[in-house]
Structure formats: structure tokens, C-alpha cells
């Protein structure tokens, strides 16, 4: 079946220190609030999960709890900081990284760590209820338009889906190139899981500049 989607668009003025429920539909809920630092947060939940998305700060997923278990890394940040510097706000679960660059800038280069996406200020944001072949879902999404007069003009549109009675969330991403020339891009879905006691990290990439 084709996807069905009913959107509720919102804007920064909807967010304050008094939580505002933007959507309530059965087990689904979307609540807008503002942290003490001034950062906008959107708490979404179903019967099994709750997550906090930062709609105007790169659409980062700041926090996620599934089946009563916190999945988010422990850090020195108890809430998101009002900054655009990667290291000054490294506390969330998921960050979109890239697109025009992704690594650390050299001394003669000028671009932010992990590109422009982690702290992108989205022009279009929404929540809503949708349905596809997997069932009914709560959605949070938006579009970030990046313009550079000499090289780039693209739209980046992530969409986070939380399905009914499910402990699985899905991230869908669309990238649209507005120029006639091809768009060369780099992307990383940067996920910071909470460490599990006695866990073991398996690293398989060859350790040289060609593979890393």
C-alpha cells in the first residue's frame, strides 16, 4: 500500500517551559517543550517507547527509552546546550552528520566538525500520524535547505517513524539536489548507545588511511 500521512506543522513559538501536547491519538503522543537552555524538544511516545527529538538542532534524537530501558549514552550534559559546536553538546543518542564534509577540518579548511547537519536549523518541521504496509506510526520530520552560491543547493529531509505497539523506530532520509550538476556528499548516522556492562566492541576495518 502507498504511505498515508497527516501532518501537523509547528514552529519554535510553540515551545515553552509549559509542555504543549501537539498530538494525541490512541497510544501516540507528541509534546512540545523547551529546555532550561532554550533548546526546543519534542517528546514522542507510544505504548513501549519514548524519545526526545531536537527539531531545530539538527533533528538530533537526544534521548530514547525502549521497554523501560534507557538507550542513550551517559555524558556530562544533562540537557542539550544552545550551541552549534559539536564537542559542546555531545550528549544525544543520534546525530545526522555530513553532507558536504564529515571529517575534521585541516588548518586551511573552514567547515564544522562532522559537517553542517548535526546542528542544522530546520526551516520546515512537523509531526503527524501515518500508515504504511507495516502499520500505523507516529512521525517527526522536517526539511533543511542548504544553499551555497558557488557549489551546493540541496534539501535534506529526515523522517523518524515510531510504529504502533512496537519497540522499533525507523529513520527515513531523502536528499534532493536542486542543482543540475551532481551532488557529491558524505553521510554518517552517528549513534551513541549506552554501554552495556561486560560488552565487547568488535572492530573489523583495516587500520590505514584507505579504509578509515
Specify the residue positions occupied by each region the protein language model found.
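Hydrophobic beta-strand positions in extracellular immunoglobulin-like domains
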Residues: 174-175
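Surface-exposed acidic/polar loop and edge beta-strand patches at domain peripheries
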Residues: 1-164, 168, 181-186, 193-212
